[in-house]
């Protein structure tokens, strides 16, 4: 991968304040580059970035961006592509009076099915219990957060055997929907 090729990248608003570097848990995920006009900016090393989002929160200049496929999503809906959505329970909690309207708009736009990720959490819980019981696996790391898994994979590989071999609730839900619905 390399510069600006991952999920997170730097845009032209960077003023090299280094706040992104100071909050990043992965020292090798950011580096300074000299641009053709003589100015500098901090780039994201796509292979090292774990996409945790800390730099987004720290940057007051909105110099960090991410690959956004929202436009493609709506284009696909217009073309009639059958799309199902998995919605995090936090969405309903954050928008308790509006979430039904938002989901209704998406359904009217052509979304085939809308499912709560809590459904995937039930599958994940079953898979954890099943794995622990069948393999007598104690002291494992059960982590549905991709940023933590990416961090372990890239920076502490000796912990890989401790990661529970179970997908996140989102992935379990998506796999079930794709296979059975």
Model-derived features: positions:
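Iron-sulfur cluster-binding cysteine motifs and their immediate structural context
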Residues: 2-9, 15-45, 50-70
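Alpha-helix N-cap/helix-initiation motif
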Residues: 13, 48, 162-166
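Iron-sulfur-associated redox domains of electron-transfer enzymes in respiratory
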Residues: 67-181
């Amino acid at each position: 991968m390399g510069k600006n090729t991952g999920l997170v990248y730097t845009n032209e608003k960077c003023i090299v304040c280094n706040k992104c570097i100071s909050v990043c848990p992965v020292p090798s995920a950011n580096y300074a580059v000299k641009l053709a006009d003589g100015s500098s900016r901090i780039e994201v090393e796509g292979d090292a970035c774990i996409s945790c989002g800390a730099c987004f929160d720290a940057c007051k200049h909105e110099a960090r961006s991410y690959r956004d496929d929202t436009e493609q999503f709506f284009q696909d809906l217009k073309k009639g592509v059958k799309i199902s959505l998995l919605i995090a329970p936090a969405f309903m909690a954050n928008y308790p009076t509006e979430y039904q309207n938002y989901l209704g708009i998406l359904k009217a736009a052509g979304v085939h099915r809308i499912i709560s990720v809590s459904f995937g959490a039930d599958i994940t819980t079953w898979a954890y219990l099943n794995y622990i019981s069948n393999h007598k696996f104690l002291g494992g790391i059960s982590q549905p957060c991709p940023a933590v898994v990416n961090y372990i994979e890239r920076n502490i590989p000796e912990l890989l055997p401790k990661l529970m071999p179970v997908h996140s609730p989102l992935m379990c839900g998506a796999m079930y929907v794709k296979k059975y619905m």
